[in-house]
């Protein structure tokens, strides 16, 4: 349920089989080892620049870019809490927390902001806590049975990420 997952579905369709990885390094490792035919990784974000870990991993692993895609990034606040006032904790990956910082300060000034490894992991945590929320893709709500307390909470609406599809052979 990460933004990389939704970008992959957008590009490859639902006919492709997807499975979660713990982090970007694991995607590279699984593509190199043959556990996965392809991987989807973020390369650049229009607000925060290059995704340094992805560039570093290209230097360590023999993988090739098969395709690239650009995806608009819009964040939602996902929760089982009945209202914003009931939210005490917000989980997300550090980038969405930063990209929504102004909105969070304005609407949830007392909430604890907890960085986790991915937006999907954040949503899973929020699903298990009645006073918690997660920042992530709106489609995560359907996947985990969460409500959407707010949409388009990013501070800058022109947020795009360049994703690349990587594979073990040159395209």
Task: Give each language-model segment a name.
Residues 1-171:
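Domain-level signature for soluble enzymes in the chorismate/prephenate branch of the shikimate pathway
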